[in-house]
Amino acid sequence: MAMRIRLSFERPEGSGLCIMVDLLRASATITAALDRFREVIPVADIEEAMEYSRKGYLVAGERGGETLPGFIANSPLEVKNYRGDVLVLTTSNGTRILESVKSDALVGCLNNLDAVAEAARELSDEVEVVMAGVNGRFAIEDFLCAGEIIAAIDGEMDEYAEASVLAVQDRSLVDDAIRRSRSAERLGGLGFMDDVEYCIKRNITGNVPVYRDGRIELMEEIRRLH
């Protein structure tokens, strides 16, 4: 049976395996963090994140791209400077999307492009890529990242998914569009342009983060335990 792939915005609309895409920067931060931490706990609420911090957990968090006081940045480059058992993460968009997912979900970005596509093919014949967007608005960087993931999975696509694949035929244009996106411009203004360049890198890791029961672990770790 051919893979069936659909693309949606902010929340899953079907019952297939979800891949959450928040290119700038939650997806990349989570993927990088799992090199240094056993698991990531995503929380949507700042107060809940602060409670974790008071209990001694390391917390990464931002709103509107700005790092929250007392937390480390939602940055794939910054999390590489830390190591531990658990990282708590709260972000403007990606963590909120994960909390709305009712079943298991993968976390996808360009850094783990082929790895997450291969995992999706292995786990299900029905996949839904969910774009996080920015505060309820369409984000071109998520659309383009989704297109590359969907192209790598390769299957029967709904029209939205097909449009995203058609949009990523020229990789140099994709990269330019991501760099010129509202999100990238804001991050650049806050001093995080290195993060943007990092998030554009493709296939630099085989990490496949899996969100399950409120926590994110590597797929290989879940396999080992189950």
UniProtKB/Swiss-Prot annotation:
Q: In which pathway does it act?
A: Cofactor biosynthesis; coenzyme M biosynthesis; sulfoacetaldehyde from phosphoenolpyruvate and sulfite: step 2/4
Query: GO biological process annotations for this chain's record?
Result: coenzyme M biosynthetic process
Which InterPro entries does the UniProt entry name for this protein? ComB-like, ComB-like_sf, ComB_archaeal
Q: Name one GO molecular function term.
A: 2-phosphosulfolactate phosphatase activity
User: The organism sits in which domain of life?
Assistant: Archaea
EC class name: hydrolase
EC number(s) of the enzyme?
3.1.3.71
Signal sequence bounds = none
Read off the Gene3D superfamilies from this record: ComB-like
Catalytic function, reaction form? (2R)-O-phospho-3-sulfolactate + H2O = (2R)-3-sulfolactate + phosphate
Which coenzyme or cofactor does it need? Mg(2+)
This protein's UniProt keywords: Coenzyme M biosynthesis, Hydrolase, Magnesium
A Pfam family annotated for this chain is: 2-ph_phosp
PANTHER family assigned to the protein according to its UniProt record, in alphabetical order: 2-PHOSPHOSULFOLACTATE PHOSPHATASE-RELATED
Entry's family note: Belongs to the ComB family.
Q: What is this protein called?
A: 2-phosphosulfolactate phosphatase
Species whose genome carries this gene: Methanothermobacter thermautotrophicus (strain ATCC 29096 / DSM 1053 / JCM 10044 / NBRC 100330 / Delta H)
